[in-house]
Regions:
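Beta1/beta-strand and adjacent pyrophosphate-binding region of the FAD-binding site
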Residues: 2-16
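Short beta-strand to alpha-helix junction loop
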Residues: 96-124, 176, 258-264
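Conserved Rossmann-like nucleotide-cofactor binding loop
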Residues: 16, 39, 174
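C-terminal helical "tail/cap" subdomain of flavin- and related membrane-associated enzymes
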Residues: 340-453
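Predominantly flavin-linked oxidoreductase catalytic cores and closely associated redox partners
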Residues: 125-275
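FAD/FMN-dependent oxidoreductases across multiple families
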Residues: 161, 236, 255-341, 346-347
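Glycine-rich FAD pyrophosphate-binding loop
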Residues: 11-13, 23-47
Length: 453
């Protein structure tokens, strides 16, 4: 028995668990955090932030800003079409005005995050706090009172037992509690195979660094690429995220439709060539190879997010298509309000489920783009899809503003959301789309003055 004291327990010390620990410690709430230290050599997911994630990173973790890089654009490569969504708040005044009116702190950019350096620094910070009791281990069993919907006991791999006052399951795709408690799960996709890696600059070192590809137009963009069998030898959706001394590159492919491509090395070779064809030659700057990670996953949402004394935190409750940039944002939302579950779990669960379900429309839109036939995808459809994505993103941020910002900001957010839902306020042609030869697409999309469709 580690402790007779009944205190909160966090299972998992990835970003979700660490962020929750940080909040509990700030509230002087003693707790256990069970997991393992982050491995600074293993590539991670969740490096491209959406709006709310970027704001929360800046506000909750200001001391780690050396790991944040400006994200000024999202670029979609979809066959002959290339789409630019401009996110620089220093030049996009309408976007900046939205944040200001709804009560968010003023900030200039969305972010890419160096998760290797950030996670190591955050882990060091939380485990040094006297309110966090870190246990390097894993949970092997839980004793669950089904009638009371409460977790009574947690059993660790060394046989130790804890009697928690509350449990935050931050195990992400492992989904420890859902499997132990038999929580019904609705899968939102077929089985996916996600393959990703980091390519490093020869001078790479763990810690803050400047952007080694800074002179390239794509160095401050999340570049998303719809891969096709005809053009690239593989079907899926890929990403390229520059992060100072290294670049994060990967893809999510349908496991069944790409059965002929079995080697993770082969997948990365196809991916490297696909980006080079579009004018993004990241290997020119980042020549050093690292571990290639290959995992099978499905996107999902559980029937419920929590019970009387437990919560499926962030990615343990639901995961949607990665281009939404929502994974870390939901983790930080969970962390910001972590103490609310200790006071009123039923109310907190209801608000939480309502908020996270607002990401489902974005998942559906990304699914349309990813499953579409590139030959049939028109620029009008891309405008409709990207405008719908932005509309849903702004609606999510309005919902978030209602729970975290000033009363005036929350009121304006409620009004804006209502106008969008009534279709009295519409987002039209926010992104820019052009048709271009594949080898010229990257050059053309960043060239001012070209005629857009």
């Amino acid at each position: 028995m580690l402790s007779e004291e009944s205190i909160p327990v966090i299972i998992g010390t990835g970003l979700i668990g660490m962020a929750i620990s940080r909040t509990l410690s700030a509230k002087n709430i003693k707790h256990f955090a069970i997991g393992s230290p982050p491995n600074p050599n293993t590539p991670k997911l969740g490096e491209s932030m959406n709006g709310e994630g970027s704001m929360d990173l800046q506000q909750l973790f200001p001391e780690f800003r050396q790991y944040y890089f400006p994200k000024k654009n999202i670029i979609f490569y979809t066959g002959k079409l290339v789409t630019q969504c401009h996110l620089d708040l220093t030049t996009n005044k309408a976007f900046a005005a939205f944040f200001y009116l709804t009560g968010y702190n003023v900030f200039e950019n969305l972010f890419h995050v160096d998760r290797l350096g950030f996670d190591v620094a955050l882990f060091d910070s939380i485990t040094k706090n006297e309110n966090c009791i870190f246990i390097d281990g894993r949970v092997t069993d839980v004793i669950y009172d089904r009638d009371g919907d409460k977790i009574e006991e947690i059993v660790l791999s060394d046989g130790s037992k804890l009697h928690p006052s509350f449990v935050f399951d931050a195990t992400n795709h492992v989904r420890l509690l859902p499997k132990k408690l038999n929580i019904p799960c609705n899968f939102l996709s077929e089985k996916q195979r996600t393959v990703f890696t980091h390519y490093r600059h020869p001078d790479y070192k763990l810690g803050p660094s400047d952007n080694k590809a800074q002179k390239e137009s794509w160095s401050h963009s999340t570049s998303l690429l719809k891969l096709s069998q005809e053009l690239d030898g593989i079907e899926g959706m890929a990403w390229c995220i520059p992060l100072g001394d290294y670049v994060s590159v990967g893809t999510s492919i349908n496991a069944q439709k790409n059965e002929g491509v079995t080697s993770k090395e082969q997948i990365m070779e196809l991916l490297d060539r696909a980006y080079q064809k579009r004018g993004i030659d990241y290997r020119k700057y980042y020549s050093q190879e690292t571990e290639i990670v290959s995992i099978e996953n499905q996107y999902f949402i559980h029937e419920r997010a929590g019970g009387a004394n437990w919560l499926l935190a962030a990615g343990t409750y639901s995961q949607v298509w990665f281009p939404s940039g929502s994974g870390v944002a939901i983790a930080l939302y969970t962390a910001r309000f972590a103490d609310r579950w200790l006071k009123s779990p039923k109310k907190a669960n209801k608000q939480y489920e309502k908020f996270i379900r607002r990401f489902l429309p974005s998942h559906g839109i990304h699914d349309q783009i990813i499953s579409s036939n590139l030959k049939d995808l028109t620029y009008r459809q891309m405008y409709q899809l990207t405008d719908s994505l932005l509309t849903n993103s702004l609606s999510i941020m309005c919902t978030y503003a209602q729970s975290r910002n000033s009363s005036l900001g929350a009121l304006i957010a409620t009004l804006i959301k209502s106008l969008m839902e009534l279709k009295l306020l519409k987002i039209s042609y926010f992104c820019k789309i052009l048709e271009s030869e594949m080898e010229n697409q990257t050059k053309d999309i960043y060239t001012e003055g070209l005629k857009y469709l």
